Amino acid sequence: KGRSQGTLFCKNTVINALLQYYEDNADQSEIKTVIRVCADENLPVPEVEFCIIIGNLLENAIDASRPLAREKRKIEFYGKQEGAMYLISSVNYYEGEIRKRGRRFQSSKHTGNGVGIWSVERVVEKYNGMMTIDVGEEKFEVKIAIPIE
């Protein structure tokens, strides 16, 4: 049983279960997580596509954090409505090289393009949102803003 058994992140049961899954997954790899998501009524995209965003960002963050020294294993993930926008922020640390070809990130799991971040980008663009990726020396940060209809 993970520590998140029963953690209530939001009122949406599907999204809450997904967040619990990733929190447990991170916990098993001794990755510290700070997850604050308000996903109650006004989701900026259909629930299934919201789960694509959350799942891909958290899975990438967990995969990048696993090989790090324990004190650097930390993920911060936030999602909330601010005015007419829904904002998502994902921050994690990483080691090694982040490869890109043009605008596309290359996968660290296999040769070729990374599908996860591209899937997130497609959902964000489909709903007229904006996504920025800031790659620092050790820190990887994704910021998303999607208008709420």
Q: How should each PLM-predicted stretch be described?
A:
Residues 11-29:
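Short beta-to-alpha transition helix within the HATPase_c
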Residues 7-11, 33-53:
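Conserved short strand/loop->alpha-helix "switch" segment adjacent to the catalytic nucleotide/phosphoryl-transfer site
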Residues 47-70:
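Conserved ATP-binding N-box helix of the HATPase_c
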Residues 96, 136-143:
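Glycine-rich nucleotide-binding loop
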